């Protein structure tokens, strides 16, 4: 089977789908990814990728869209999104930019199925045009609320009726934790964290168990520090200075000069796979990104979430409502201490980790997709 993955050019949208794409490859299926910007890093996962948007990043794409619809982001800041449908206008813009490259890739490569990241309608249009199944892959706790249909309708205003036609078959893979959401959409899939790879020193923070002293991981994800600067972490020097914990700051190579001199027990890490560091930590403080949220849940680590953008507040609320962490506008020492000292948070986080391990693994879902498509289910027979 050949699977063409059409992905919104954002790590947070594409990286959650990497384990399923690996599972398909391990079965002997062929995979080709069409995306752009930072999401081209998926090539580091051993997956072939087509650069559909040469020279573009998510920041430049958002900037270009803002020029055409300046009121959209203003309205979004005033009234945060509640479902993915709220992002339909910008998702339609991104789909429009990806559509022709995705069409060309499909014409040349002739896939048997399309995998699209959540709300990425370019994949849906191509699946409909070729009469092949669409698999839409979720990336967190945000619910669809008809986002795919809304985005296709906006595309149809430019493409004509063909743009609104649905694929012949559609499957949705939901990586949200069942106990932390109102209802699972489609097929449940275990969230297996993928944050890239790294060469790790045996003596470093990423190998081994938790140290005797509490260790707190601090991260602002893949976008926030680069788009908003170190000001997103302005709280850190003061909180760390008066706290007993050791702090690991996963900065991803961002410019931190505006933070000034950091206390000696704050260690700055470059790009670091969170899944390798989190098991050594007693807590994580972050912005509410889906990838970080799910990685912490998989590791059973309590979270202090200060939501920043887009769906961040949805993830923060899911964590807080489950008792696996706390939500705060600005992290402070008192709240962090409460998170570390109250055992109920760690207990709830471990319960969620156990729940995640009970969900269908990517290999299981890959086999189910073969069955759904009427293809052989024995590994290697596809």
Curated annotation (Swiss-Prot):
Which pathway is recorded for this entry?
Answer: Antibiotic biosynthesis
- Single GO MF annotation: hexosyltransferase activity
The membrane spanning regions, by residue number, are none
Instruction: Give the Enzyme Commission number.
Output: 2.4.1.331
**Which UniProt keywords are listed?**
Antibiotic biosynthesis, Glycosyltransferase, Transferase
What biological processes does GO assign it?
antibiotic biosynthetic process
Q: Which reaction does it catalyse?
A: 8-demethyltetracenomycin C + dTDP-beta-L-rhamnose = 8-demethyl-8-alpha-L-rhamnosyl-tetracenomycin C + dTDP + H(+)
The observed outcome of changing residue 312 to S is: Increased transfer of L-olivose
Q: What class of enzyme is it?
A: transferase
- Database matches in Pfam families: EryCIII-like_C, EryCIII-like_N
Q: Which residues form the signal peptide?
A: none
The answer to whether keyword Flavoprotein applies is no
Matches recorded under Gene3D superfamilies: Glycogen Phosphorylase B
Q: Does the keyword Transferase apply?
A: yes
Q: What does this protein do?
A: Glycosyltransferase that transfers an L-rhamnose moiety from dTDP-L-rhamnose to the elloramycin aglycone 8-demethyl-tetracenomycin C (8DMTC) in elloramycin biosynthesis, an antitumor polyketide. Possesses donor substrate flexibility: able to transfer at least 11 different sugars to 8DMTC, such as NDP-D-glucose, as well as NDP-L-digitoxose, including both L- and D-isomeric forms of some sugars.
Q: Which family does it belong to?
A: Belongs to the glycosyltransferase 28 family.
What is the protein's given name? Answer: Elloramycin glycosyltransferase ElmGT
